[in-house]
UniProtKB/Swiss-Prot annotation:
Residues 70-316 form the ABC transporter domain. Residues 392-603 form the ABC transmembrane type-2 domain. The chain crosses the membrane at residues 12-34, 446-466, 493-513, 528-548, 553-573. This is ABC transporter G family member 7. Belongs to the ABC transporter superfamily. ABCG family. Eye pigment precursor importer (TC 3.A.1.204) subfamily. Residues 676-725 are annotated as: Disordered. PROSITE patterns: ABC_TRANSPORTER_1, ABC_TRANSPORTER_2. GO terms for molecular function: ABC-type transporter activity; ATP binding; ATP hydrolysis activity. The gene is ABCG7. ATP binds at G108, P109, S110, G111, S112, G113, K114, T115. SMART domains: AAA (SM00382). One of its GO terms (cellular component) is mitochondrion. It is a multi-pass membrane protein.
Amino acid sequence: MAPFGGKSLADVVSGIGGNGVGGALAAVAAALLVRLFAGPGIALLPEDEAEDDYAETEDGGGDSIRPVTIRWRNITCSLSDKSSKSVRFLLKNVSGEAKPGRLLAIMGPSGSGKTTLLNVLAGQLSLSPRLHLSGLLEVNGKPSSSKAYKLAFVRQEDLFFSQLTVRETLSFAAELQLPEISSAEERDEYVNNLLLKLGLVSCADSCVGDAKVRGISGGEKKRLSLACELIASPSVIFADEPTTGLDAFQAEKVMETLQKLAQDGHTVICSIHQPRGSVYAKFDDIVLLTEGTLVYAGPAGKEPLTYFGNFGFLCPEHVNPAEFLADLISVDYSSSETVYSSQKRVHALVDAFSQRSSSVLYATPLSMKEETKNGMRPRRKAIVERTDGWWRQFFLLLKRAWMQASRDGPTNKVRARMSVASAVIFGSVFWRMGKSQTSIQDRMGLLQVAAINTAMAALTKTVGVFPKERAIVDRERSKGSYSLGPYLLSKTIAEIPIGAAFPLMFGAVLYPMARLNPTLSRFGKFCGIVTVESFAASAMGLTVGAMVPSTEAAMAVGPSLMTVFIVFGGYYVNADNTPIIFRWIPRASLIRWAFQGLCINEFSGLKFDHQNTFDVQTGEQALERLSFGGRRIRETIAAQSRILMFWYSATYLLLEKNKPKYQKLELLVDNGETGNSGVQLDKAEVDQTEKPEDDDINQPLDDQNQTSDSDDELDEIRPFVLEGL
């Protein structure tokens, strides 16, 4: 007899009864499986080969760093509002320069555009149809699109796999990003050097931790983020408010680390709100922003105090210079009078610095440039051809996923206790059911509850965890560490043993307590059905987590979607009575197939006590009332497997579709004929051009008619000392 009841495997998987839904799901899953295994290790950008910053010095982890100077000019970023037809400027004609060996801090009040400018320079500004970004960006004197370079971007949120130690986190990062380090000894030596360099030796073997598991401190997590970014020896380091959420001591240690990295030859750029005095003293250069406009750019220390002192704004003694500068360039919204006076002061300072910086020009005028396809994506993966293959990535990620899943003691203990507790409760309610007519309804109710409980437990666990993990994966994939296929497959396989344990516990306790069909084979099939259902629910949770942006949204969408599947699960609405427009839902409902399989397993061959001829005498008659007659368990398992593959395929597609996309920089045109072609950043003289009209920010960089309005405004401001600092 042929397997699967005389049908081929393809026939079984493609659907039941020849329905089109099953065939479509199987086709999508098959296509995605081919894509999953056929994909390259790393997707490389198809542009021309870019010059490697480490072509001569890189040896799989060497410390040689090629100096990189980044110059930006007239960066303008606007956000349009279609409903009100208004435009809000996030950045207006911002210019500046970051040099190797120097720590540059972007400072300003909240909402001044610090993070926006940092994201623009790093090519990390999220893509939006409402955003318009323009300006000039050069790396070592060349347009950023023609020369790629290694960069590190340390975000405010420190996201890690919580169950790994600090050393393991760095080791996996080194293996994924530096496949050329083949021996474990070299990798361990490289990781140990990073631990020593970042001051993480004391916590190297400590668990990173999270909100549930106590781990390393916030400052240590920030330094670990830096260490992970330094794996590939980047030339440029971007840090978005690295001291946020840290106490004074930890903030000091983090900034000391950034200062040392700058002294090692890195170009370090960070955004920071209002640092303490000792932190401000570590800055080599600063850029001051207010309401998206440039107020000062140049050396830090006493130079900005001297500059603003020339206009009568004197910093009192024993006052933190950073606090003084922050108050000076902020608008006070406490009253209409303070708003007017502070705005007048800020606008005058902006105009004064714009005029001052436009007095010194570039030695060589910039030539005409056009928009490039990838001008704002200077990623390392565009210039490095990865040598690690698909399977190497898979086994590394499988090891990491298994360590994360198996070590998650608190979560696993809670899941185990809930599985046993729910089984005990249900077993007590349906204690040792007999063979009476009323037991038929009890058995159906118990099997429906078992299917719902198994699915909801797996779903809620996945949607509560995966959105956070997706953020980590998106960051690692954006660095070119690995591709999506190995990650998704490794995660699936690593979680099979842990995921199977809980439905097995549930079945082992519930089955004898309720006295379901008392044969070993039926018990094995019961556990097998709920286990496959648990895997399908987890796959559905992955899809929900890949579809929505946050854990909160996933927790709202996942159970709501599962409720729809419960309604069409075969117990509340008979499949034969389902309206035609909704008949596809039972076919896609994992609850329906699990309930059907459990009913077939329980009722087949069962005899019930009866007194009347119209009573249900056999289990087959009970199955007919549910429209499950003539079905087989293997068909339900095949349907569940088909649904599982569909959800995994949907997860793959959504993760590919929703991967981070970044805004392109539209390069402004400069024909070199105007006198205002730029500035040479020397000491306090900063690259900045005149402020364009608000209604035309994209005009060519031509000379603007300068007036003495700003001078008049400054003359009207009487010199004063900021009080109350």
